[in-house]
Amino acid sequence: MQAGGATAAATPQVAGAKPAALKVSLSLELRCAKPGPAAIAVSLPHAWRVPNTVARRAVWIDTSHPDAVTVSRHTVTLQPRTPTGTCTMIAPGTIKVKFTRAAKLGNPRKAGRYTVHASIGRQDFSAPVSIKPA
């Protein structure tokens, strides 16, 4: 995946599945292979079922849970853990955001191709997600 690219996949991929997991991979320039202090906003299509709250332990950013998770309509905003130490290496990398089934997301009730949007700082991403008939 090139810098600025994104992929997303729901598990299961079946229409109406709830709870469903969602994995979003974002490719961008990273400082020391970490997302940095900027919040990660993941915007789900209106057909997706999103709870009013999501527990931070129900979400992973790479290998750790975010420090905070907030929900506003269909946008879930994640605050990554603050990096520790000093590092100046900037290189292309991939951040993997995973909403486990414990996040209680629900797939759209109709099969089709949907677009998940994400942003980190000034960088915007979009990725298609295919939902199959039940």
What does each model-identified segment do?
Residues 1-134:
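Ser/Thr/Pro/Gly-rich, low-complexity intrinsically disordered stalk/linker tracts of secreted
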